[in-house]
């Protein structure tokens, strides 16, 4: 006799294949085969992998399909091991510690995504990070607890290459803090906007600068975008950020960086290229600056969302 799953409000709106992938302990090819052979049905009707499931839909599955809720140990979010900044029925926002990856990968034994799967094992929809922070970056991480909120948050965290000119007229929606080598006060005062075109060096396995055009104000930044555009050139992509010096102490500076684009290692590369690498950054800082006692610090400290139906507030900070 076939089993069935009921689509909850949290899980509605996603594709059938994604719903089954999140609900069952099964390989992708198994799920596709069950759908293709009619062993999976939506409200007693044959379905396709990319059909959208809705709240209260009944999804028939084979009797031998292992339900994730039955095969994983049940835990509650009360045991969640990270500081919670904000939470409601749609969204969970945590303070991610340094040293843990957001997603699994080579050599990543522990990551946020797998921890969410474990702690929400009984849920019909497993919450997931809406964006990524590097393993060594700490701070605000947005997590969608429903399919709809996850999709909304993911879209919010994307940079819109077509509207960068409008974006730089306002504060960036993602703000970071970092300690850098050197006294950056004068540089930050004269160059509050950093504009680099970055590319990935396969041989060195790091991001490098194709060329630089810094700006003294928002109008100059808009002019740079208008002149050079946002489309990749020679495989290099635009990386745009604002810069402010908060404190200078013992030959190091605490800075605030607002990013308008989301390039890999963007903050680390832009500051290193400007002559002020992050303290303890073994990948981009010159070895002559590095000291054993230096501790890497890069923190996502503020995120601004547009008005929405999923959160009661729009600005989140630590």
Model-found features: residue ranges?
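RNA pseudouridine synthases
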Residues: 2-318
């Amino acid at each position: 006799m076939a089993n069935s799953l009921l689509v909850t409000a949290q899980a509605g709106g996603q594709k059938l294949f994604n719903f089954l992938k999140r609900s069952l302990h099964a390989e992708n090819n198994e799920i596709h085969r069950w759908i293709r052979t009619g062993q999976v049905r939506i409200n007693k009707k044959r379905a396709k992998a990319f059909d959208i499931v809705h709240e209260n839909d009944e999804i028939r599955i084979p009797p031998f399909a292992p339900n994730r809720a039955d095969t994983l140990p049940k835990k509650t979010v009360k045991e969640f091991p990270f500081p919670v900044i904000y939470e409601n029925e749609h969204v969970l926002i945590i303070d991610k510690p340094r040293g843990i990856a957001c997603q699994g990968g080579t050599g990543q034994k522990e990551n946020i995504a797998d921890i969410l799967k474990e702690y929400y094992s009984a849920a019909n929809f497993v919450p997931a990070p809406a964006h990524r922070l590097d393993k060594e970056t700490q701070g605000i991480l947005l997590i969608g607890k429903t399919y709809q909120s996850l999709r909304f948050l993911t879209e919010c965290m994307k940079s819109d290459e077509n509207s960068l000119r409008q974006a730089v007229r306002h504060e960036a929606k993602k703000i970071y803090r970092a300690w850098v080598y050197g006294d950056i006060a004068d540089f930050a005062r004269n160059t509050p906007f950093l504009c680099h075109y970055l590319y990935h060096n396969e041989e060195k396995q790091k991001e490098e600068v194709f060329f630089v055009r810094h700006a003294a104000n928002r109008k100059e930044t808009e002019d740079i975008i208008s002149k050079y555009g946002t489309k990749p050139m020679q495989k290099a992509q635009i990386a745009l950020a604002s810069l402010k010096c908060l404190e200078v102490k013992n030959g190091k500076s605490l800075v605030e960086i607002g990013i308008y684009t989301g390039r890999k290692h963007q903050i680390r590369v832009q500051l290193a290229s400007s002559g002020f690498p992050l303290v303890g950054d073994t990948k981009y800082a010159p070895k002559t600056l590095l000291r054993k006692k230096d501790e890497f610090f890069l923190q996502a400290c503020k995120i601004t969302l547009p008005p929405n139906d999923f959160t009661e507030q729009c600005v989140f900070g630590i």
